Amino acid sequence: MAITQFRLFKVCTCLATVFSFLKRLICRSGRGRKLSGDQITLPTTVDYSSVPKQTDVEEWTSWDEDAPTSVKIEGGNGNVATQQNSLEQLEPDYFKDMTPTIRKTQKIVIKKREPLNFGVPDGSTGFSSRLAATQDMPFIHQSSELGDLDTWQENSNAWEEEEDAAWQAEEVLRQQKIADREKRAAEQQRKKMEKEAQRLMKKEQNKIGVKLS
């Protein structure tokens, strides 16, 4: 029984392979026929009537034929020059403010004073000296506030008096600072003694209260 079933299975498999092979051949032949029937034949002739006509192409040498060959300026060369000058004058000068102004510096020349030669009684001329007297006029400055320079007397003790006044002011300030410091210390000591007295009074009151109880 098992042998017959095995033989039937082999026969069925062989038939299935044969049918599948035939089916593939049929499919391939159908595809080839469809491709051969779908071929499109292109026309070999070209219709030039559908092509748009091109415009006439001009040569590049004929472009400037219509251009003017000469330009005539009315009024002559003189009028053109005057017009150009007037236009240049109307244009504002933007760099006018930026031009530097050059000023010459004033030179002060000091001339050397020539030495004066005073005659000696015997007729010979003497030599100049820095201690020799000159003929310059004396300069006297008069002021309404300070008075005449001749009447002003120099006080040599002015600097010493100012130093003494400054030292006295510093001494007064130092003494005042010491007094303020001592006053603050005395105030702190008084407050401390008052606090101590209050603390002792509280202790005494507590002791009296304990004794009465």
From Swiss-Prot:
Positions of the UniProt region annotated as Disordered: 179-213
Compartments in which it is found: Golgi apparatus membrane
UniProt note on tissues of expression: Widely expressed. Expressed in heart, brain, spleen, liver, kidney and testis.
Bilayer topology: Single-pass type III membrane protein
Residues in coiled coil: 163-211
Stretches assigned to the Extracellular side: 1-7
GO biological process, one term: adaptive immune memory response involving T cells and B cells
Parts of the chain that traverse the membrane: 8-27
Modified sites of kind Phosphothreonine: 41
Induction: By 17-beta-estradiol (E2).
Signal peptide interval: none
GO cellular component, one term: Golgi apparatus
UniProt modified residues of type Phosphotyrosine: 94
Residues in the Cytoplasmic compartment per record: 28-213
Domain of life from the UniProt record: Eukaryota
Record keywords: Apoptosis, Coiled coil, Golgi apparatus, Membrane, Phosphoprotein, Signal-anchor, Transmembrane, Transmembrane helix
Keyword Membrane (UniProt): yes
InterPro entries per record: Cancer-assoc_antigen_RCAS1
Matches recorded under PANTHER family: RECEPTOR-BINDING CANCER ANTIGEN EXPRESSED ON SISO CELLS (PTHR15208:SF2), RECEPTOR-BINDING CANCER ANTIGEN EXPRESSED ON SISO CELLS CANCER ASSOCIATED SURFACE ANTIGEN RCAS1 ESTROGEN RECEPTOR-BINDING FRAGMENT- ASSOCIATED GENE 9 PROTEIN (PTHR15208)
Written domain comment of the UniProt record: The coiled coil domain is necessary for the homodimerization.
Subunit structure: Homodimer.
Function in brief: May participate in suppression of cell proliferation and induces apoptotic cell death through activation of interleukin-1-beta converting enzyme (ICE)-like proteases.
Protein name: Receptor-binding cancer antigen expressed on SiSo cells
Gene that this polypeptide is encoded by: Ebag9
